[in-house]
Structure formats: structure tokens, C-alpha cells
Amino acid sequence: MPEDGGGDSGDVPEIIPDGEPLREEQRPLKQSLGSSLCRESHWKCLLLTLLIHACGAVVAWCRLATVPRLVLGPEAALARGGGGPPPTYPASPCSDGYLYIPLAFVSLLYLLYLAECWHCHVRSCQAPRTDASTVLALIRRLQQAPPCVWWKATSYHYVRRTRQITRYRNGDAYTTTQVYHERADSRTARGEFDYSAHGVRDVSKELVGLADHAATRLRFTKCFSFGSAEAEASYLTQRARFFSANEGLDDYLEAREGMHLKDVDFRESLMVFADPRSPPWYARAWVFWLVSAATLSWPLRVVAAYGTAHVHYQVEKLFGASSPPPGAVPSGPPLSRVATVDFTELEWHICSNRQLVPSYSEAVVMGAGSGAYLRGCQRCRRSVSSNSLPPARPSGPRLPFSRSRLSLGAGGRATPGVFRSLSGGPLGRRGEDTEPLESPPCYEDALYFPVLIVHGDSGCQGDGQGAL
């Protein structure tokens, strides 16, 4: 795993462990001033700063501004009696104690401002700080880590319980019974996606240019995709089988799913510096608190956001990387569809393709001459179930379509009635000569009780005319 070719990577192409060519490059992006403001507006800090400065302006106005006030007393009465203007004197507009109102607001807002600055500092310290070489080594481990797509199903129900609580009314304490419901987990199952038959490889990008910026905020996410339809169908089938196997075991089912990388410490956010021992001036703690004490924290945050580059690195795993060769024959049966994975009987009919039901139009146009239609296939037989014919007033509920198809597939005692036998045997020809042709059945009879063609296990061995 060579990592010492940082500056000469353009001369010798790098080969990743899979033996594939160089990955697509991804570089950190330094945002403009407007985009950095939209990304991290810090509107709480801005609002508190504006309110503090507004209250400070009111206090300064109360201390510096003067307004004329009338003189109260005998001098004012003598002046009004002589016909002259009333005597006034300059005074502060907040001289009667109104100065304490904006001072109280300033003190309260300043405390809120310091609390908001403390929360901002804590959030910034939550992201670990590291250098570019450590991040590149971490990315290499993330690329080489095998993925694990997991599912978790928790079956639970609620239990009704009671407890004694003490309440107070009019100074008197009394005990009452409270009824509440508590969740009780009965069973927890976990499963993983088995991708050994399809293979997996990492298709993440190659991160370059971290050392070109003084500070870079790195955000990690992980995802997976499919390189073939077989891998996607296998994932959906395993997922559906897992949750269907754990469904119905209790009153409720909590389903969770996700992905993690094995044998690696995945972090969602990192702060990368070119030299962690001497970070830029706007990223130092003492500068932050010194500027925050002067109520200039918001401009400092804008400068820090503008000087920090951002990059969103996505670790992507591709399932289905090792697809079988074009001439290879699949070893197992085709994958079942997820939409009908719970309908075992329907899936069996679709996969085996043993019963072919003619439509109503095909059943009407079938005549006696169509007996040669089935002579080419010696393994096909046509059967009519006289026991399944509908009575005049059906007394019970109608069977499901799949069950009715199975009942009609078994050969019963054929009686002349709605459907004519087309087996081509002597009994069938004698019946045609002696009995008149009857009218076709009604639509519901033909829909619910069709005439079926049942094939053998090996299928038709004729010239392909047995397909209906």
C-alpha cells in the first residue's frame, strides 16, 4: 500500500489493491461568501448580537441625549403670571429610572449570547481534528473494509400494567391507581445480506488536495449500489424472506436496516488542518472567546466559514462486481420475484409452467377438429371436472383462483355437458356423432372453471404445437 507518492502521482499511475485503474478524483471546494452564509447562517448569534447592540444604543441615547423639561415650583408660576415663556431645563430622557429597563435587557441578552457561543464552541469541538495524512490512511481503510448490510426485526407487544401514584388536591394527599401500557419485546432477529455469490468492490472516489487548504471540514457517508440485476434481485429476495419470516410472530414488528463497515472506526465528521499544531487564527479557542466577549462572534464565524473548505466524501460499495462469464450456465434455479415471495403456490405454478388456461374466446372457437391440436404432444391430457361445475345457486364461498385451478387440474369423470371432450379418442368421436352441439357456457363458468391442459414433467416432446 504505497502512500509516499504524493507529489509525483501524475508520472506513475497508481494501482488500487483490486488491480483497477486510478479512481475518479475528488477535491475540497472553498465556498464563496454568499454560499458560506447560506450554509451556516448562525441566525441565533446574529439576532442576539443585533438586540444587544440595539439595547446598547438605547442606553447610550439615554446617557447622552437631553430633552427640555418644565420647571415646577413657585418660579414657574411667577413666570406664567408675567406672560413670559415657561422656564425649562435640559435633562436626560431616562432620568426617572427608565435607564434600568434597557440595562436589564442588555444583561439578559448578553447571558443568552454567551450561552449560544458556548454551544457553538462545543459543536465545533465535537469534530475531531487531524491532519491530511491521517485522513488519507483512514480513507484507505474505509475503501478496503468489507461491507455488512444488516436487517433487524423486533417482535413486541404491549402489556397493561397498573401503579399507585400520589396526587394532591386542596392540600390533601390521596392515592390513586394509574393504568399504563408498557412495551415488551418477545423476539429479536438479525440478518445480513449474503453477497458471496456476486462479489463486492469499492467504487469510492480518490480524495486529493487536502493539503492545499488551511482548514477543511470533511463529512463522511456510506452507501451501496448494485452492478447487476441478479445481485439486486438477490438482495431484495433475502430481505423480503427475512422480514416475512419474522412477521406475524407477535402483535407488532419493528423493522430496521442499515449498513456498516467491518473492522473500521467510521466517523461522520472530521476537521482537517494542514498543520494541526498551528491551526489558522480563526480556529483557535482563545481568539474565539476574546472576540465573543466583544460581541463580535458572528463576524468571526463568517470569516471562519469562508476560509474553511468543505468536502462530502461518500464510501460506496458495489455489489455484483464479479458477474459470471457470458457462456456460463446458472447452477441453481432462477431467483423468485419479491412481489410474490409469500405466495408459494403461485410461484410454483409460474416456475413449473404446468397448467395453461385458455381464455373464453379460445374456449368458444375450439371445435371438434382441433383434436389434432393436441395429438402432437403425447404427454398432454385434457381433463374436465364435472364435479366442479357450478350449481344453480352456489351455497358456499368461491375458492381462490389458485385452489380452483388445482382442483380442475385433476382428472375427473367426464360427463357430457358444458365442455366437449377434445381428446380425439373413439368415445369423443362417438359423442360428436350422436349428440348435438351445445351452446357455449356463460362467461362466469368459463372464467372460474376453465378446461385445463396439464403437461408432464419433461414438457412437450412434439414440434411445439402443444403450447396454447
From Swiss-Prot:
Its main location: membrane. The chain crosses the membrane at residues 45-65, 98-118. The keyword rRNA processing does not apply. Belongs to the TMEM151 family. Signal peptide: none annotated. It comes from Bos taurus. InterPro entries: Tmem151. Residues 1-25, 384-438 are annotated as: Disordered. This is Transmembrane protein 151B. The lineage of its organism: Eukaryota, Metazoa, Chordata, Craniata, Vertebrata. Keywords: Membrane, Transmembrane, Transmembrane helix. Pfam families: TMEM151 (PF14857). It is found in: Membrane. It is a multi-pass membrane protein. One of its GO terms (cellular component) is membrane.
